[in-house]
Structures are given as structure tokens and as C-alpha cells.
């Protein structure tokens, strides 16, 4: 299935290259864009399909939205492979919300974790990687926006009912963890 999709994406990218008289770099960008789109589409189907199966769709959505609202500005660690990304996504966005709902976790524990994650976002965002470098002129704005969004979500989490408050806090915790320098070996903040 994967190889069939790769061949189809390659054919679409080549067709667009020929039709629009694009150079090799433009072709590679189109191909990468299509690969990312379809990979994310299939990953979304798998994650939300499992969320429906486990009856945690709204919980998964809540964690996902808080996570991605911050990640858009904070960036962060990526899985090493597509397969690892699927596994991590299932664990982070389906299994962890399910556990959070099923296990009675003290509210103060989640608040402390979210506060620590907020500090990590303040210290380390935006997390710059070799594959996703951030130009110098954008770093300060992204950092400020990531801190602002994380702060707003943390404050909002105090005013919404359980379990959604803890799910928003879980999203903050996950993106805070994705900022940790341990995920970026042999890299400096300069990229």
C-alpha cells in the first residue's frame, strides 16, 4: 500500500512539474508536500478512528487542539520514522487521554505538570531542528506567541470542567516535553 501511494504521489508531482514547467527543486517540494499531506491524512484517520473505537474522540480532540495550538509556534521534537510517529500519536493522543479519564489523577498533579511544561516552553521554545530550521528573525515572535498561547490555555484550563481541564493541561504537558533538548542531540539552539 505504501509503495503504491509513493508511486502515485511521484506521478502526480511529475505531472505537475511537466504541466507547469517546474524545475527539479519545485518538483521535490511538491512531492514532499504531497507526502506530508497524505501521511498526516492517514495518521489522522488512524488516530481518530482509534479514538472513536475507544470512545475518547472528544478527549483526543481536546488534547490534540491544545497541543497543536502551541506546537504551531513552539515546534518541537519529531518521531524518527513514520511508523514511530504513528505509535507516538496513538500513545499520546488516544491512550494517554483514555488513561487520564479512567484513572483518578489528583488535579494538583496535572496542574504542577502543566506549570513545569509551561516553564519548559518559556525556556526552550521554539525548538529548532535540522529538518525544521527557524530563521533568526522569526524566533523571538514564535517564542512570545508560544508562551502567550500556552499561558492562555493554562488559564482557561482552570475555568473548564473536568476532565477537559486536565486534557488541555495534558496537551500543554506533551508539547512542553517536546521542547526538551534531550530530543535534539548534537544540535545547538542555532540549528
From Swiss-Prot:
What is the protein's name according to its record?
A: Accessory gene regulator protein B
> Origin organism of this chain?
Staphylococcus carnosus (strain TM300)
Tell me which Gene Ontology terms the entry assigns under biological process: proteolysis; quorum sensing
Q: How does it sit in the membrane?
A: Multi-pass membrane protein
Transmembrane portions of the chain: 45-65, 81-101, 108-128, 144-164, 165-185
Q: Which SMART domains match?
A: AgrB
Q: What is its EC number?
A: 3.4.-.-
Q: Which GO terms describe its molecular function?
A: peptidase activity
Task: Tell me where it mainly resides.
Answer: membrane
Q: Give the location in the cell.
A: Cell membrane
Known role: Essential for the production of a quorum sensing system signal molecule, the autoinducing peptide (AIP). This quorum sensing system is responsible for the regulation of the expression of virulence factor genes. Involved in the proteolytic processing of AgrD, the precursor of AIP.
Assigned GO CC terms = plasma membrane
Family according to the record: Belongs to the AgrB family.
**UniProt entry keywords in alphabetical sequence:** Cell membrane, Hydrolase, Membrane, Protease, Quorum sensing, Transmembrane, Transmembrane helix, Virulence
Amino acid at each position: 500500500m505504501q509503495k503504491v501511494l509513493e508511486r502515485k504521489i511521484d506521478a502526480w508531482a511529475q505531472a505537475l512539474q511537466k504541466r507547469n514547467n517546474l524545475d527539479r527543486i519545485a518538483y521535490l517540494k511538491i512531492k514532499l508536500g504531497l507526502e506530508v499531506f497524505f501521511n498526516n491524512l492517514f495518521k489522522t484517520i488512524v488516530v481518530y478512528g482509534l479514538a472513536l473505537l475507544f470512545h475518547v474522540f472528544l478527549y483526543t480532540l481536546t488534547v490534540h487542539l491544545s497541543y497543536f495550538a502551541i506546537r504551531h509556534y513552539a515546534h518541537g521534537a519529531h518521531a524518527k520514522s513514520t511508523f514511530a510517529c504513528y505509535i507516538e500519536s496513538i500513545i499520546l493522543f488516544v491512550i494517554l487521554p483514555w488513561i487520564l479519564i479512567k484513572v483518578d489523577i489528583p488535579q494538583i498533579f496535572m496542574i504542577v505538570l502543566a506549570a513545569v511544561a509551561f516553564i519548559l516552553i518559556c525556556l526552550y521554545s521554539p525548538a529548532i531542528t535540522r529538518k525544521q530550521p527557524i530563521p533568526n528573525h522569526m524566533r523571538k515572535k514564535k517564542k512570545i506567541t508560544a508562551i502567550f498561547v500556552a499561558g492562555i490555555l493554562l488559564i482557561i484550563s482552570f475555568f473548564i470542567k473536568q476532565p477537559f481541564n486536565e486534557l488541555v493541561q495534558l496537551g500543554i504537558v506533551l508539547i512542553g516535553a517536546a521542547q526538551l533538548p534531550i530530543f535534539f542531540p548534537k544540535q545547538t539552539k542555532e540549528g
